[in-house]
Regions:
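C-terminal binding/interaction regions
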Residues: 2-15, 21-29, 34-122
């Protein structure tokens, strides 16, 4: 990421989504949120650090479990309001707090997706 890239933290009340992807497999592992402070800490440390919306504090993913997310590369989307971190997962590779590699483990059926679309229209 070039030094002149400015991340847009204004659209979501000071936060921007951070998508985490395994650099080797391409699998999407998780989504978290960053504020300017957590983004600066991420770039400085080389490990993904989020802003915990629940605890209202910085949260280096894997700091306790040992499954830290070491950054291989970082990029932004065309609007500069979403970040993509390609990472190497340290430790046993289980990123999700439920003990799975990815947080995205609950498939939706097409019928459920259609029902969800209908619910949002009403």
């Amino acid at each position: 990421m070039s030094n002149d890239t400015k991340i847009d933290f204004k659209k979501m009340d000071g936060l921007t989504p951070g998508i985490v992807q395994d650099a080797q497999t391409g699998e999407v592992l998780m989504l978290g949120f960053l504020n300017p402070e957590s983004f600066a800490k991420t770039i400085e440390s080389g490990f993904v650090t989020f802003w915990s919306r629940t605890r209202q504090k910085l949260w280096m993913k894997g700091e306790t479990s040992g499954n830290r997310l070491r950054i291989v590369s970082v990029s932004t989307d065309c609007d500069q309001d979403t970040l993509l971190f390609r990472v190497f997962v340290e430790g046993d590779g289980l990123v999700c707090h439920e003990g799975t590699v990815s947080c995205f483990t609950r498939p939706l059926t097409l019928d459920a997706s259609a029902s969800a679309r209908e619910a949002t229209r009403g």
